[in-house]
């Protein structure tokens, strides 16, 4: 099941299917009243669409502290029996992570309707309520960037969200064991201080301040050692695991089950290990086997068999969580190499993807500064998934001011510069913007998308919670013509691909300078025809430049009159 918000701007594309959808419950006196009410709720951003293999359900909700309250509902597709219907809607309610599923009606229900609700476990008359039952899993993917996963756990723990099952591959197996122990401080401190030599047995290297030079030296050293020795020894990782894990505590945890994934060699067969059911002395072996990225690292021998990283067969083990009884899962993908295993999820299985759009650094080369950044990213991403903050690339207390600024900008383009904005009706424009933003963009969220893209161009880091006004001020003060001197020191070690993009952007800086000067000339000279030409030729790039100009023009007003927006 996939649940997405429905925006009013989608009315044209969704008009036909919603006109064919019907309300299964008597929220309104007619189906048409229900459809009209759905679009009114879409204007208030309270409308959603749930899609599964058989059904598409459109619904609107209100939320209180512990309740999800359905107040309108339309179904497209064949009708199902009541038991399946309520299970489906309760799955939709679990998506919002509340205690109770409620249905609120404007008029008293008939005895027959009350009988149907009460038979399916609901209580009440006008508002029908039922306590939701959760069997939650935490799915920890492979990919070395384990600090991000611990950041996610910090946010979950902060809001008392518990899970019955943990499944982990590679670094996810190690973190699963740390989480099973429940010692947050130990897990955070471990990742904050972790370096490559605490994981892999590499020869000592002279200290190097330059991050790029250090990266290439460590990579060459790792490659050479792996080739000579048939995989770098993970003896330091083994010591760290044994020093930090309480095996008795892991073995006898009564509330959470931990399952790890490894790959048996040479068959390349997936092996799932129930950590609590294995021998106590073998627990470190199975965790290390799951994290042995052979041939870069040495394989792990358990008994007579050889095992390597579980990511070769199942890098994001959602299917194991489902097979062990999970009805929903927080899935933490940390950008491990290789494709994910294809699985078929049950219609009523809910999963929340907890992954960042930002790259997380080098694979197998660990850096304490980058780990601290990734910890913060994981924490903030999970807080957004839980609905406490907002944003896509960045994290905001509220994004409403972004919509206000954007409306002001569009008015500036049409009324002051008198530009024509027909490209907003072009599918290509929205496709390009979505590809650049790497997420869904609709007219209602366009202002936020453009603001975040500007923030990226101006090197703002994503590891803090922003106010929209504060972000705009920082964007306007940051010179796009050069990267901040301390940027790399704040980020930490980069990956090969990140270094490549870093060099590429340094080469593009001159082009950015030229563009800025050119558009400043057009705006100062009010060259409407040239501006219109550029806007139609390259709408996304041109909009970003014009939006920055507009925001800079607005800054003096906002400094003195902060309530303008």
What does each model-found stretch correspond to?
Residues 1-37:
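Short amphipathic alpha-helix that is part of the acyltransferase structural core
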Residues 44-45, 98-102, 324-327:
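Short, high-confidence coil segments that cap the C-terminus of an alpha-helix
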Residues 66-120:
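Acyl-donor binding region in acyl/amide transferases
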